[in-house]
């Protein structure tokens, strides 16, 4: 039995990207964090979606029909994500690009699956999302199960630390990644001194830093997002701790440098490839810059690819029924700004690759050697 969507939901932001939608316009929900601690990631997502919709419509839309993005703020909060999902059901929208954080995507996906709404997430990396046999759930993001081993391989083969601490934020995304890295390091017989969690939103890491110093830790892997990592780096360096830090794409954000300052220099981070540096994407990069939008963020491109994939299936398929679009994408794939994409039966991408980058104090990054 399908869940009954709530008819009145408070605190939800829903803004049409284009005004005055016509009867033949195709509405697509764009869901991410406009508010909350990781709103910077939401900025990337919305910028990518807006540019993709603009470019697709400029080329004739979907057989003459325009895409209209309707934006919702879930703040990467699970409860708010459920409220947003119910709002989308009430709004009669059949297609969702989002959510971004794994912890908010999973509960929302339950509603979309029950209601027959196609969801393509550009950011949820936790493998559990697609392990439940759902038909309507897909993603253009890679998985923690591939990002974690990429980090572990680099740590074992390049860094070769002697005493490792693995820390996470006790959230689905961060802890999942931390455990994936832990598994990879254990296979390589690395010396993991401790594995522990902090509280998301925490700002005082004096006790943790004292512990790192006491245990002579020379390498820290942190599974989580940039607000906490930025504070850790800043406080560690202020206390004379020279330990190497590493994190996932959730920490690779210019806002980390705003928090950590010079302490951000040299942090290691696993991220998708730099799609803004692909010559094939030059026109999109220039369009984003002309609109005063940063084209360097990974979620700009992964979200653009999600919208592209949806549009490709709509153009190819005789039916716009969500399940027919899912079947089309799984059978035929899609050519996108991040390359040709293929999906398995669970809705996961085949062969998505992460790279290891060195972060710099000015918010830029270069491929790690």
From Swiss-Prot:
Coiled coil: none
Subcellular location: Periplasm
Top-rank taxon, per record: Bacteria
Signal peptide (residue range): 1-23
One GO-annotated biological process of the protein: valine transport
Any Pfam family hit: Peripla_BP_6
Keyword annotations of the record: Amino-acid transport, Disulfide bond, Periplasm, Signal, Transport
Principal location listed in the UniProt entry: periplasm
Disulfide cysteine pairs (residue numbers): 76-101
GO cellular component: outer membrane-bounded periplasmic space
Keyword Isomerase: no
NCBIfam families per the UniProt record, alphabetical: PRK15404.1
Job description of the protein: This protein is a component of the leucine-specific transport system, which is one of the two periplasmic binding protein-dependent transport systems of the high-affinity transport of the branched-chain amino acids.
Sequence similarity: Belongs to the leucine-binding protein family.
Protein name: Leucine-specific-binding protein
Organism of provenance: Salmonella typhimurium (strain LT2 / SGSC1412 / ATCC 700720)
């Amino acid at each position: 039995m399908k869940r009954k969507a709530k008819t009145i939901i408070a605190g939800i932001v829903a803004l049409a990207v284009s005004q005055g939608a016509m009867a033949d316009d195709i509405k697509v929900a764009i869901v991410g964090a406009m508010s909350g601690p990781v709103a910077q990631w939401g900025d990337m997502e919305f910028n990518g979606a807006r540019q993709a919709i603009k470019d697709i419509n400029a080329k004739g839309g979907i057989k003459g029909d325009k895409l209209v993005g309707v934006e919702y703020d879930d703040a990467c909060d699970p409860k708010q994500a459920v409220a947003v999902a119910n709002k989308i059901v009430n709004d009669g929208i059949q297609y969702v690009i989002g959510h971004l954080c794994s912890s908010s995507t999973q509960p929302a996906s339950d509603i979309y699956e029950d209601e027959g709404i196609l969801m393509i997430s550009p950011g949820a990396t936790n493998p559990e999302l697609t392990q439940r046999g759902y038909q309507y759930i897909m993603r253009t993001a890679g998985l923690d199960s591939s990002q974690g081993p990429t980090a572990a391989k680099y740590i074992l083969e390049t860094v070769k630390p002697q005493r490792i601490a693995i820390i996470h934020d006790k959230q689905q995304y961060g802890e999942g990644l931390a455990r994936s890295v832990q598994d990879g390091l254990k296979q390589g017989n690395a010396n993991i001194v401790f594995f522990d969690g902090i509280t998301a939103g925490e700002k005082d890491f004096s006790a943790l830093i004292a512990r790192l110093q006491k245990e002579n830790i020379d390498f820290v892997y942190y599974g989580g997002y940039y607000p906490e990592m930025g504070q850790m780096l800043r406080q560690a360096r202020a206390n004379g701790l020279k330990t190497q830090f590493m994190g996932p794409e959730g920490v690779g954000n210019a806002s980390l440098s705003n928090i950590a300052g010079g302490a951000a220099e040299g942090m290691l981070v696993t991220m998708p490839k730099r799609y803004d540096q692909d010559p094939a994407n030059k026109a999109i990069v220039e369009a984003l810059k002309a609109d005063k939008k940063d084209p360097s963020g990974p979620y700009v491109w992964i979200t653009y690819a999600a919208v592209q994939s949806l549009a490709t299936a709509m153009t190819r398929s005789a039916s716009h029924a969500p399940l027919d679009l899912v079947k089309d994408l799984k059978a035929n794939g899609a050519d996108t700004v991040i390359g040709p994409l293929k999906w398995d039966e669970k809705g996961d991408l085949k062969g998505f690759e992460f790279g290891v980058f060195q972060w710099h104090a000015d918010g830029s990054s270069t491929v790690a050697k």
